[in-house]
Amino acid sequence: MIWTLAPFVALLPLVTAQQVGTTADAHPRLTTYKCTSQNGCTRQNTSVVLDAATHFIHKKGTQTSCTNSNGLDTAICPDKQTCADNCVVDGITDYASYGVQTKNDTLTLQQYLQTGNATKSLSPRVYLLAEDGENYSMLKLLNQEFTFDVDASTLVCGMNGALYLSEMEASGGKSSLNQAGAKYGTGYCDAQCYTTPWINGEGNTESVGSCCQEMDIWEANARATGLTPHPCNTTGLYECSGSGCGDSGVCDKAGCGFNPYGLGAKDYYGYGLKVNTNETFTVVTQFLTNDNTTSGQLSEIRRLYIQNGQVIQNAAVTSGGKTVDSITKDFCSGEGSAFNRLGGLEEMGHALGRGMVLALSIWNDAGSFMQWLDGGSAGPCNATEGNPALIEKLYPDTHVKFSKIRWGDIGSTYRH
């Protein structure tokens, strides 16, 4: 996922529970399903939490934020310990005001909130919590499939409704310096290695980057879509510095992506096309191993769609002189690519085997208008229609709906 503005990860508190503040987080319920070939799909009483940086993190006993336009307020946070002593995180009680709504097994994410004549940009990002509400749900997807329904019909050019996996810690990095943990959305990381004010819930007083493996199952709007693994040659959250955070560093920032339009299938995905984004459809992603076991080596990432009861095979495209319809070692074999230098599918598979956290978000891109996803050779959108100012003016109701999120044995999550 290529963010142009770093999403902030928050700190939180030290030894006493008071450091978490007096307002508990609401954690909207979102039913998900775990599936097996033998027993079908079982309901899970899971919930979501907004990223910690969305929460108000302030100096204890005051309304003074622990961050400013330059990052951490160094008067409050001169070092990690003092930062943890000083800063408190407040829970969020009204998720709708942050663009997040759930109903049974459906999650709706809104980009904008309209109040009277005013429009506020929100860009919410949430993580899936386990049934205990204290830890993230850890998805182990080797030789498994992940499936969801999506309504992307209002996601115009320049928007990105994303569903992806991050190798965060189950606890959100909970520690003596971070008593908030996953319950308050701490611990975010991805393959872009951004330098954020907080890392694993602790003040980033040394200005390091936060890296981890990232599996972009779904980055899309109504006009284009991408499926992209981003391996790193590290395990879990890794704090980078200098060149280790850059394009030649520990993570593959670009990834090895499968975008049907970008690979030549220009009539496959979009309004009124084979996968018709005017309507809701189902997305199935399979993580196949070399020996068809959950302990094998990741060898292929396959994609299927289902719409109006019909299974739609992934677009068959030409790459490297061959017809391909999935992500394999051969597909990603570009000479000198960071993907292969950093371990490729095998390394990505290690993270999928250890367990990854599900993140869901909506955002737009003031830096490049999301052209890397849907413009130029990647999609049909022109150079300016993804401008967030234009989207806000013309499409203030842009949103994404994810529903019926389920995962389990290959072939167990859909009818075929």
Curated annotation (Swiss-Prot):
Residues 1-17 form the signal peptide. GO terms for molecular function: cellulase activity. Its main location: secreted. Optimum temperature is 45 degrees Celsius. Stable up to 50 degrees Celsius. InterPro entries: ConA-like_dom_sf (IPR013320), Glyco_hydro_7 (IPR001722), Glyco_hydro_7_sf (IPR037019). The active site is at residues 214, 219. Glycans are attached at residues 45, 104, 117, 135, 233, 278, 292, 382. GO terms for biological process: cellulose catabolic process; glucan catabolic process. It is found in: Secreted. Pfam families: Glyco_hydro_7 (PF00840). GO terms for cellular component: extracellular region. Keywords: Carbohydrate metabolism, Cellulose degradation, Glycoprotein, Glycosidase, Hydrolase, Polysaccharide degradation, Secreted, Signal. Gene3D superfamilies: Glycoside hydrolase, family 7, domain. It catalyses: Endohydrolysis of (1->4)-beta-D-glucosidic linkages in cellulose, lichenin and cereal beta-D-glucans. Optimum pH is 4.0. Stable between pH 3.0 and 7.0. Its EC number is 3.2.1.4. Belongs to the glycosyl hydrolase 7 (cellulase C) family. Has endoglucanase activity on substrates containing beta-1,4 glycosidic bonds, like in carboxymethylcellulose (CMC), hydroxyethylcellulose (HEC) and beta-glucan. Involved in the degradation of complex natural cellulosic substrates. This is Endo-beta-1,4-glucanase celB. It comes from Aspergillus oryzae (strain ATCC 42149 / RIB 40).
